[in-house]
Amino acid sequence: MKTLIILKDLTKVFDNQLILRGINLEIKQNEFVTLLGPSGCGKTTILRILGGFENPSSGEVLFQEKSILNVAAHKRPINTVFQKYALFPHLNVFENVAFGLRLKDFNSKIKANLSLNKTHYQTNKANLSKTFHQELTKDLTQEKTTQITHNFNNQIETLTKDFETKQTALKCKKINKKEQEEQIQKEVLKYLKIMGLQGLEKRTIEQLSGGQQQRVAIARALINKPQVLLLDEPLSNLDLKLKQEMQYELKEIQKNSGITFLFVTHDQEEAFTMSDKVVVMNHGEIQQIGSPEDIYNEPANRFVAQFVGESNLIKGVMKDDFLVHFDNQTFNCVDKGFRKEENVDIVIRPEDIDIVSQGKGLITGIVQSIIFKGVHWEIDVKTAQRTYTIHTTDHVELNKQVDITFNPEDIHVMEIW
């Protein structure tokens, strides 16, 4: 996929506080990218800079290799769906969705071509006239002068006829107000159908549920066919079931429309469910960029491991390639490239730990708590060094002494940042 957007060394300062710290990010065409992080990490600020609602303190924003920092928000090929949707309460569903189209000049391309055709005509005419007058300055016979003048007049006549023919053809392509209204009607109904809102055209915004309002906001943003759609936590006000339904719908819309989506959230489930690429942020810095699978299975540091999914985080020491020491034992692992005796952070996911009979595992402990989570049990096992959180489908008795075990590939070793 071709790179569409490049953010280069972006910084942003608010009230002497550094909000963004040298952000570098590439976003490709038709990609679903999510900025994931806690409140105040700078993700919405990036969205606002890209949308043209804020300027960076330093750095560059390139769109198709050209800077757009001096391009007004309404002139960028980018639309935004805000957290509060920003719908017009005095307009019904149809008019909310049609709003952007009513501001659009449907004949703008034709007008541009008319102007371009006129410019070409004037330039070519001026060049012919210049050549003609240069010829006349030469020492010519009367017959030669007459011939040159005749040729010049024929060329001008042909050029003018071609120009007028093209202008007439272009003007015929212009659409009148009636045709424009018919096109708006067709486009609005098309997007209402895509968003599952057919039949609700005449309803007021107050008569819609939260999910329906969100669909209206997305339809209004999509109808102008932007190259990029920015979404600022649009699912945060929805109930769990509706949120899950909208996650699927948004991904389908993005895939079918070919529009690049940049989504902002603090919810890892939203990020993982929809995204091609996840950008994890904290304190105005990018912590890790990768696919949902990479972010979860190979977190770059302690923050990412803690923020994304539940984790058992442990401090340890690398003894050698494929050998790490923690909890008074040395374990086999699959990591290498660290210095010997280097202090490291270790993450073991709860679902990667198994509870086995005493004497058959790696570490011994006592079952301290059991919580039923619906699809699994969350069990805390207290060992001599720490408490491990484990997710299992097997029920275990409280206060029972057990062993826990895990495989070398379940131990993920990270540098300490």
Swiss-Prot record:
Part of the ABC transporter complex PotABCD involved in spermidine/putrescine import. Responsible for energy coupling to the transport system. This is Spermidine/putrescine import ATP-binding protein PotA. PROSITE patterns: ABC_TRANSPORTER_1 (PS00211), ABC_TRANSPORTER_2 (PS50893), POTA (PS51305). Residues 105-177 are annotated as: Insert. One of its GO terms (cellular component) is ATP-binding cassette (ABC) transporter complex. Pfam families: ABC_tran (PF00005), TOBE_2 (PF08402). It is found in: Cell membrane. One of its GO terms (molecular function) is ATP binding. It is an enzyme of class 7 (translocase). Keywords: ATP-binding, Cell membrane, Membrane, Nucleotide-binding, Translocase, Transport. It is a peripheral membrane protein. Belongs to the ABC transporter superfamily. Spermidine/putrescine importer (TC 3.A.1.11.1) family. PANTHER family: SPERMIDINE/PUTRESCINE IMPORT ATP-BINDING PROTEIN POTA, SPERMIDINE_PUTRESCINE IMPORT ATP-BINDING PROTEIN POTA. Residues 5-308 form the ABC transporter domain. ATP binds at residues 37-44. Its EC number is 7.6.2.11. The complex is composed of two ATP-binding proteins (PotA), two transmembrane proteins (PotB and PotC) and a solute-binding protein (PotD). Coiled coil: none annotated. It catalyses: ATP + H2O + polyamine-[polyamine-binding protein]Side 1 = ADP + phosphate + polyamineSide 2 + [polyamine-binding protein]Side 1. Its main location: membrane. It comes from the Bacteria.
